[in-house]
Amino acid sequence: MQTLSIDLETYSDQPLAKTGVYRYVESPDFEILLFAYSVDGAPVQQIDLACGEKIPSEILCALEDDKVTKWAFNANFERICLSRFLGYPTGDYLEPDSWKCSMVWAAYMGLPLSLEGAGAVLGLEKQKLAEGKDLIKYFCQPCAPTKSNGQRTRNLPKHSPDKWLAFKKYNIRDVETEMSIQARLLKYPVPDSVWEEYHLDQEINDRGIRVDMQMVENAIDVDGWSRFDLKTQLQDLTALENPNSVAQLKAWLTE
């Protein structure tokens, strides 16, 4: 095995766009739902983890094998998610040196930084499936409890087998599209120096920054005291119940 192309579908109660992948995977509710992969460009295989299937041992070994190059579109997401799945402690992750990101390749070529956008510009035969956004919202995020859904806060495969089947197809197609991007750009390789920069970037992000938590906690306390003091002064000055209210403050200013 020389290369492993990967795409994951995951669940977490943390909003990925707001928290970033590191906080996202630290949630106790985080889990990998679907694992689609291709070994050395072979037809895509899929592991339905949500329904009890297991990742083959040779694939698990390949994830930690520096001799196997792992590919994904926005590979940082797959690498960090799989680190959590493999039981790495918080702050420790799969080494980035054996990972390459086709989004970086797309960026190097001036293409859109999305799988859908890059595929469209390149005119790929197998485009990213458009219905994916709705399926991700359905299966990958908490849902609002309602009478019609039995007050549940999460949608599982059993709640909509048809949608789950479509979601599995979407997951497989993402790997196919990612591999097609690689094939189309094969004549325009990313220089080794750029991959070195990418790996350094990943190490920096994995390491994070040191934070003086005592200073942070004190700053929060000072902010609370300051807000209370300023609000009290404004109440004394204006006699308003809530001087933070724009409507009340406008009315006071016009008196």
Where do the model's predicted regions map?
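Cytochrome P450 core scaffold surrounding the K-helix E-X-X-R motif
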Residues: D13-A17, Q46-L49
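Ser/Thr-glycine-rich phosphate-binding loops at phosphate-binding pockets of nucleotides
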Residues: L8-Q14, R23-V25, N74
